[in-house]
A protein has these predicted regions:
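Pyridoxal 5′-phosphate
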Residues: 1-423
């Protein structure tokens, strides 16, 4: 059962939201997450997912294995980054085996893949001007180190990236780096169309999947993607600082070489030889020792997603965000809010951005006085992250209800004007 028009043809009621929850095919997954927070409404899973019982059990089992097996555990752990990558590829990324690794952080993986892509290719690096800052920072450093132009693509603050604008910027470029889902607006790019356009221009494309993996359908192989990176602590619920992932299409693996050469990517790892020779296949994009305990949580997240099915997850994300959009129009637009997210479900991921001139103080007031946890992004956005595996329709309704009441009563006006370090 998905979200459609209000059942009474008028306002969106809490009873309607509750009816949607009763028909939710994914409802049973909610009980597999920890919710020891009373009446708190958590709508920040786009920053950090909840702890699942599956992840807790997987981590505990791995700790016990460490305690019992000690170093002999490495006979099973040595290939864990690849096995976990294959599980992610199948459940979340539309990637066949041997193309995904779970390792390092998104930032490090971006550096590795972007650096590898630049080595044999000449031309500029292209990135949207409003892309997530770490992507721009890494690419700025690589551009300086390699003597390349960093070409910024301007875009609409709400609408998805336009294919024509990206294609024009890609002309003569070596590498184009794009976010599949924009971290601020939630706008969802057309991966297949943009990939075709970029490749027609002679460039490689690297997709940042941090805000799409585990929330929307991703099909890297079918789209013809070249490279991708992403994190696992948002919609894959693997915990703070959990290992990220990288994807290198099989057709590119032999020609690319990571700029970070480590012993786990050495062709004959335990020969301990004097010279580095990269391993064949996806393993050449590893570096140091994999974080085994963290990978256990990633594997648990991939398993839950595979069980739910990305199609069902995507459908519910569309329904949850549609409810949030309708409630914005009905309850928030008259209080100074504007919608910072595309209205068409096909054009957005699993979070909704609400813009307001006093967004920071409203966000803090929600946390401190209404027991609602969203997050804030400069300059004026409150993001409601709605992970489908544990978010209910009534959670969306209640969060907006508390938000509207708080702003109407001016509670936020008592909050400090200056943002904290963590927003």
């Amino acid at each position: 059962m998905g979200y459609g028009d209000p059942v009474d043809g008028g306002s969106v009621t809490r009873a309607h939201a509750a009816e949607l929850d009763r028909g939710d095919a994914l409802a049973g997954f909610r009980d597999r997450f920890e919710h020891g927070d009373g009446d708190r409404i958590y709508v920040d899973g786009n920053s950090l997912g909840r702890l699942s019982h599956d992840a807790r059990a997987a981590v505990a089992a791995t700790v016990d294995e460490w305690g019992g097996r000690l170093v002999t555990g490495w006979h099973d752990w040595v290939d864990l980054a690849g096995r976990t990558g294959d599980a992610l590829g199948a459940a979340a990324l539309g990637a066949g085996p041997g193309q995904v690794l779970a390792c390092d952080s998104t930032t490090v993986n971006l550096y590795k893949l972007a650096g590898a892509a630049l080595r044999p290719r000449q031309g500029a690096i292209v990135v949207p001007a409003d892309d997530f800052p770490t992507d721009r920072y890494v690419l700025e450093g690589l551009a300086a180190a390699h003597g390349r132009e960093l070409r910024l693509v301007a875009g609409d603050p709400v609408a998805p990236l336009g294919v024509d604008a990206v294609a024009a910027a890609a002309d003569g470029a070596a590498l184009v780096v794009l976010s599949h889902v924009n971290y601020r607006s939630g706008a969802l790019a057309d991966m297949a169309a943009i990939t075709r356009a970029v490749r027609s221009a002679g460039s490689l494309v690297l997709w940042d999947l941090c805000h799409s993996a585990g929330a929307v359908a991703v099909d890297l192989d079918v789209a013809g993607a070249d490279l991708a990176v992403g994190c696992t602590y948002k919609y894959l619920n693997a915990g703070p600082g959990s290992p990220a992932f990288l994807y290198v299409a099989e057709r590119h693996q032999a020609a690319l070489r990571s700029p970070i050469q480590g012993w786990f990517s050495q062709a004959d790892q335990f020969a301990m030889g004097p010279r580095y020779e990269p391993a064949a296949g996806i393993g050449r994009f590893l570096a140091g020792t994999p974080p085994v305990i963290g990978l256990a949580a990633v594997m648990a997240g991939a398993g839950m997603l595979a069980e739910a099915g990305i199609g069902a997850v995507r459908a519910k994300a569309a329904g949850l965000t549609a409810l949030a959009v309708d409630l914005h129009d009905e309850r928030l637009a008259g209080l100074g809010f504007t919608l910072g997210t595309p209205r068409a479900a096909a054009d957005r991921g699993a979070h909704v951005s609400l813009r307001h001139p006093d967004a920071w103080r409203i966000c803090r007031a929600l946390i401190e006085h209404a027991n609602v946890i969203p997050d804030f992004r400069r300059p004026d956005s409150i993001r409601l992250g709605l992970p489908p595996l544990y978010t209910r329709y009534v959670d969306v309704w209640d969060a907006v209800d508390r938000l509207a009441a708080l702003v109407a009563d001016g509670v936020h006006e008592r909050m400090p004007e200056h943002a904290a370090r963590v927003t």
